[in-house]
């Protein structure tokens, strides 16, 4: 079963290479989508892939890389679209 989630990560998640490590984890789990920093200090991401792999990436985000401190993780399931063929780091607020 395919799955899509929209994720917001709160805590010490900027300046600790959270986006780069999320991309590496997504590639390892064969999950597509994107990740970006938000001006309010959170990290936002969209993950698409097979349900077990997306769930594994969500679990990874609960901990994050070694220097991150994840205080809260919001996960919202969305309708799977299959629109992504890779996993990207976005560097502005446009997710298109």
Swiss-Prot record:
Pfam families associated with the record: Acylphosphatase (PF00708)
First-level EC class: hydrolase
Record keyword Transmembrane present: no
Residues forming the catalytic site: 19, 37
Keyword match Ribonucleoprotein: no
Catalytic activity, as annotated: an acyl phosphate + H2O = a carboxylate + phosphate + H(+)
Domain of life: Bacteria
GO MF terms, alphabetically ordered: acylphosphatase activity
Ranges where the Acylphosphatase-like domain occurs: 4-91
Keyword vocabulary terms for this entry: Hydrolase
Gene3D superfamilies assigned: 3.30.70.100
EC number(s) reported in the record: 3.6.1.7
Family: Belongs to the acylphosphatase family.
NCBIfam families (alphabetical): PRK14438.1, PRK14444.1
Designated name of the protein: Acylphosphatase
Organism of provenance: Syntrophus aciditrophicus (strain SB)
Lineage of the organism: Bacteria, Pseudomonadati, Thermodesulfobacteriota, Syntrophia, Syntrophales
